[in-house]
């Protein structure tokens, strides 16, 4: 046991013993440990594994701990002939050990075993689903992704996480992951020729998440659309309408040749409702959407367009009629709840609109001005109070001097609203700056990747040969010397 334990602890994480060795030496240590653990016959017996798991730390010896966990899961699966043994279910010993690992693993060591790490995360999801408690997996997978830090790379685990969040209605738990910009797909071209060591601490994290690293299953075009569709649904459940509109806008803006997919049409319908609920009106589709695609969306979503028109024109009777006529459609599209919220939001936007015209109104005046409001005289004051308390309506309530029975609704002065707008704009600018910085770093990394790609190096080598040949023959033209003459031909030629 002592010899095997010595191997398990031969490559501790850098903060716990390997801080002073070079990247190259540490890379050799980790690869040697992996090679040893993969040898046939090295796996310890069932009785010994729990002892080893108690003896080593998942934070210090993450590679070894993950290896032992996977061996133990395989042994139990073979013994019980079930996919999720009782010991792996929530509350079991193996579940608790897995929780401990996913909350403390060393992300640098895990770069070497992405496939095995993802399999363990999949096991966690299956275990939670087997007892109908997906919320337990949501917390663990979220923490694991945060710890791993995928640095803006979209993986299959992101899609799994948002699906589990919708299943368990645990929407707020996934916001730390959903709020991060995703700018990359896993790709091998980023480090195919760079010779980057996986243990390097100074390289951008994006180079470690490739389609061969194992951190993600194979991704399809549909996976990308589904992720943003489900993300939009999460934001809608939290009434974060702007974020929902953004995610759904990504889906409806996806490139398409001749026709749109079903998921894109579904996203458009929800996008219409998100705009009505967030801003009380229907915005134009993003500029990336071609005009003919917009026409397809509108033709396939006519009940939603009619609903939006009635809402924008503040035609209450028509709105009720459109909602009633479309009951079957709302249910089939699973949008009944959202349409009901649109109906409830009608009064809110009617009253908010009054603030653009008046500085103060009594409650009877509010009811009179909002003539199509569905509230009665007794309900209107309670409704306005709720809007003010939830900060959906920027206004104050007070009693008129000498008349304590009449409530006055006072809208903010232009100077106050201007200050609020400035604060909102400042906050948005900070958000946009952070997003632009992320995109800028991604562009820089992409530029470096393209410059060191196999295709570009071939072009440079060919152009250098052509330049040398031209110099020897004494006919060096500026275009040929720079390699510009054959650049397009080379890129389009062999296609390698």
Swiss-Prot record:
Q: Tell me which residues make up the PCI domain.
A: 243-411
Region of interest: Disordered: 468-496
The listed locations are: Cytoplasm; Nucleus
The answer to whether the entry has keyword Cytoplasm is yes
Tell me which GO cellular component terms the UniProt record holds: COP9 signalosome; cytoplasm
Sorted alphabetically, the keyword list is: Cytoplasm, Nucleus, Signalosome
Q: Does the keyword Cytoplasm apply?
A: yes
| Record field: compositional bias (Acidic residues) | 483-496
* Pfam families per the UniProt record, alphabetical: COP9_hel_rpt
GO BP, sorted A to Z: cleistothecium development; ubiquitin-dependent protein catabolic process
Say what the protein does. Answer: Component of the COP9 signalosome (CSN) complex that acts as an regulator of the ubiquitin (Ubl) conjugation pathway by mediating the deneddylation of the cullin subunit of SCF-type E3 ubiquitin-protein ligase complexes. The CSN complex seems to link protein degradation to sexual development.
Q: Which family does it belong to?
A: Belongs to the CSN3 family.
Q: How does it assemble?
A: Component of the COP9 signalosome (CSN) complex.
Name-wise, this protein is COP9 signalosome complex subunit 3
Organism source for this protein?
A: Emericella nidulans (strain FGSC A4 / ATCC 38163 / CBS 112.46 / NRRL 194 / M139) (Aspergillus nidulans)
């Amino acid at each position: 046991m002592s010899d095997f334990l010595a191997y398990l602890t031969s490559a501790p994480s850098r903060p716990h013993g390997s801080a002073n060795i070079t990247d190259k030496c540490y890379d050799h240590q980790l690869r040697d440990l992996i090679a040893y653990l993969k040898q046939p016959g090295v796996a310890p017996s069932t009785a010994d594994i729990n002892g080893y798991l108690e003896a080593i730390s998942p934070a210090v010896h993450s590679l070894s701990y993950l290896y032992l966990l996977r061996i133990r899961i395989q042994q139990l699966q073979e013994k019980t002939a079930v996919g999720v043994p009782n010991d792996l279910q929530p509350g079991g010993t193996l579940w608790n050990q897995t929780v401990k690992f996913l909350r403390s693993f060393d992300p640098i060591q895990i770069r070497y075993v992405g496939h095995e790490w993802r399999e363990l995360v999949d096991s966690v999801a299956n275990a939670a689903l087997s007892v109908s408690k997906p919320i337990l997996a949501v917390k663990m997978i979220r923490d694991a992704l945060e710890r791993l830090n995928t640095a803006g790379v979209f993986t299959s685990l992101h899609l799994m996480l948002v699906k589990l969040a919708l299943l368990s209605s645990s929407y707020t738990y996934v916001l730390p992951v959903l709020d991060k910009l995703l700018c990359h797909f896993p790709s091998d071209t980023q480090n195919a020729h760079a010779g980057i060591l996986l243990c390097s601490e100074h390289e951008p994290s994006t180079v470690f998440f490739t389609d061969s690293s194992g951190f993600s299953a194979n991704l399809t075009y549909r996976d990308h659309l589904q992720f943003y569709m489900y993300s939009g649904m999460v934001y809608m459940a939290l009434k974060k309408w702007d974020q929902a509109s953004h995610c759904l806008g990504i889906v409806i803006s996806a490139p398409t040749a001749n026709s749109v997919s079903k998921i894109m049409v579904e996203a458009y319908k929800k996008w219409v409702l998100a705009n009505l609920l967030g801003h009380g009106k229907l915005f134009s589709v993003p500029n990336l959407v071609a005009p003919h695609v917009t026409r397809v969306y509108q033709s396939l979503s006519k009940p939603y367009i009619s609903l939006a028109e009635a809402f924008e024109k503040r035609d209450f009777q028509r709105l009720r009629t459109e909602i009633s006529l479309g009951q079957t459609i709302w249910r089939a599209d699973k949008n009944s709840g959202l349409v009901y919220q649109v109906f409830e939001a009608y009064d809110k936007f009617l009253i908010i609109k009054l603030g653009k015209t008046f500085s103060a109104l009594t409650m009877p005046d509010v009811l009179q001005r909002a003539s199509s409001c569905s509230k009665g005289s007794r309900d209107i004051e309670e409704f306005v109070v709720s809007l003010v308390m939830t900060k959906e309506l920027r206004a104050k309530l007070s009693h008129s001097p000498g008349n304590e029975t009449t409530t006055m609704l006072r809208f903010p002065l232009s100077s106050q609203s201007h200050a609020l707008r400035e604060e909102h704009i400042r906050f948005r600018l900070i958000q946009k700056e952070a997003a632009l910085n992320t995109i800028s770093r991604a562009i820089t990394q992409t530029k470096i990747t393209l410059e060191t790609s196999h295709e570009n190096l071939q072009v440079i080598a060919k152009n250098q040969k052509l330049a040398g040949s031209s110099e020897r023959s004494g006919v060096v033209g500026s275009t040929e010397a720079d390699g510009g003459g054959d650049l397009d031909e080379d890129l389009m030629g062999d296609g390698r």
